[in-house]
Amino acid sequence: PKTICTSINEVVCHGIPNTRPLKAGDIVNVDITTIVNGWYGDQSETFLIEPVSKSAKKLVQVTFDALYVGINASRRGGTVADIGRAIQSFATKAGYSVVREYQGHGIGRDFHQEPGVPHYPVLASNRDLLKSGTCFTIEPMLNIGSWKTRVDTKDKWTVRTIDGALSAQFEHTILMTDTGPEILTATKNGPQEGHKF
């Protein structure tokens, strides 16, 4: 219902921008979709409203790192399942759960298209090969508590953690090339792989 989604603290995704003031300790995900010459791009980043708790900062760091674990697991001729296995393993070892109801997706002339890109192992995704020219998003959502979510009963859009625990997300749009994954939504001033929060 808005141009961007702003998801604060326990909001996993699809948060609707409002007039609630941000306060110290909040973590805020901003998810933006663009259309350039008929092609879609999708990116999100979680920001810290300092000072934040150590647990919030660690969640954001691990989620950011999980994005690059997924990107590095993608390769031409590999499968979508390779991405999910890598992210799930990394997140679980760090003590976090991976949201299962929402996932990455193919993207191009349409915003959502095949293949679906789950961030956890799904047997069916073993069939989805990453061919040169495949464009898709990787957008892990990690929670401190349960992986389960619920949709807000009032606006029927905002997605929250079922237990009220913090959630973080990062996302890039990826193009699979003959030489491997290319990040289409990377920016000069944005955080790069290895960034520390």
Task: Give, region by region, the residue ranges found by the protein language model.
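Active-site neighborhoods and metal-handling regions in enzymes and metal-associated proteins
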Residues: 1-197
